[in-house]
Every structure is written in C-alpha cells, then in structure tokens.
Amino acid sequence: MKIYLKFKSYNKRICKLLQLFKLEHDQNCSMGLLINHNSLELYNRDNVNQKPIKVDFTSKKNHYRCHHFRRKNEVLYRVSGIKNSYFPTILDATAGLGNDAFIFSFLGCKVIMIERHPIVAALLKDGLQRGYQDKKIGHWLQTRLHLIVNDSLKMLEIPILQPDVIYLDPMYPFHHKKSLPKKDMQFFRQLIGHNYDSKKLLEVSRKLAKNRIIVKRPYYAKPLSEDKVNHIVTTRNHRFDIYQPF
C-alpha cells in the first residue's frame, strides 16, 4: 500500500514493520506515517495541526482507566461474561486501534485481534511490540493480547478459532454533527471507511462463538440484526447488543 513516509529518526524495528506490511512511500499521498523515534504514527498531511494517531497501550488514558477500575463502572467487564474465575477467550473481529481489546486483556481475558487494513495493522503491531517491552504491563500483555492480520470474514469462516466471545465494533456513519468524534478520529475513520459487511460478520460470528457475540453500537443506531437482541447494556454514548450463538 502506498503512503507518505516521514522519518524523524531511523528505527530498524519499525522499518521491518513497513516491509512486513508492504507499506511504500508515495510523495503525493495525503496520509502519512511518521517514524517518530520509537513509535509509528499516522498523520494528516493536509492538516499539520491535527494530532497524530498511534497505538499506545501504556498511555495515561489507559493507565487511568485501569487504575480506577471498578466492576460496576466498567461496561466492558459487564458485557464480557467474566464470572468468578472464568475469563472468556475473546476474538475482537474489528480491532481498530485496539482500545477495547486492551481493556478486555487487562480484565484477564485472552484476546485475539483481527485487522485487515495494512496501515492499521502496522500501528497495532507497533503498539504491541512496545507494550510487550513495558515493565509495568508487558508481562501480562504478552500472554493475553495478540494480533492476526487478515480479513475477519475469511478467518471466521474457517473454524480454526473457537472463541468464547466475539466482539464487533463496526464503523457507523455519523448521525449528526453532535455525534462527530474528535477530528483526529474523523481522519482515522476516513482511512478505515464504513463496514458494509458488518451484518454478514455478525451472522458468521453467531455460528462460531461458543457463548456470546457483543456488538458495540452508537446509542442512536439500529440493531445490526433483525433477530432478537438477547441482552442490552447502555452507556451515555453507546449501546452493547448481546446475541446468543446459533
């Protein structure tokens, strides 16, 4: 895939990632990847004031959320199916930047992320590699959070993986101006695009998951399926529709 590549400094590890995901320099591309010392960052060349995007599992935001974790306040704990000493294996079929997958892994679940877009996969892989080396979270992150680079539909149609839970967070069209995310995330969504195969993804997921399928939706969005939603958990901005397997 073609993208503008900018090096602040040479990094052998990141150069190997660029080769692995076949990311090649294009002088005319409006999207850029910045090799910023020890991290890989996506940025908008048309708006240099826009904050670059990177996967950082050691961020202050993640640290705060983990440090202040309370079962009743953490919606991902409530929808995950965790109970006593049971920690389900979760397949995140729409990994994105890995934010929710990280929280599931922090809660004690083994999580497999699937991402098909090579640029996003490179960002995730970079974040994982740095996270694995972190002294505070690396010891458990290495055993719980992993990435498969492939198309989710293709992976789910091959019954190799047998997760307890499948988690879906498909991109959804903006409803109105008030629902717009921050500008940096709007830029990221332009890269990913809308998940037109999300209904098919849910259907296939219900044939594979052992215990439940969780679909994260904006609060205003219709359910992804016309079938009955077995359980719903709501927050201020989102709704988590839980389906039973077929």
From Swiss-Prot:
Compartments annotated for it: namely: Cytoplasm
Give the GO cellular component terms, alphabetically: cytoplasm
- Which UniProt keywords are given for this protein, alphabetically ordered? Cytoplasm, Methyltransferase, rRNA processing, S-adenosyl-L-methionine, Transferase
Per UniProt, what is one GO molecular function of this protein?
rRNA (guanine-N2-)-methyltransferase activity
EC number(s) for this protein?
A: 2.1.1.242
Annotated disulfide bonds: none
- Tell me, what's a Pfam family for it? SAM_MT
| Listed transmembrane segments | none
What is catalyzed by this enzyme?
A: guanosine(1516) in 16S rRNA + S-adenosyl-L-methionine = N(2)-methylguanosine(1516) in 16S rRNA + S-adenosyl-L-homocysteine + H(+)
Q: Does the keyword Cell wall biogenesis/degradation apply?
A: no
Give the family from UniProt.
Belongs to the methyltransferase superfamily. RsmJ family.
What is the recorded function of this protein according to its Swiss-Prot or TrEMBL entry? Specifically methylates the guanosine in position 1516 of 16S rRNA.
Q: Which PANTHER family match?
A: RIBOSOMAL RNA SMALL SUBUNIT METHYLTRANSFERASE J (PTHR36112:SF1)
Q: What is this protein called?
A: Ribosomal RNA small subunit methyltransferase J
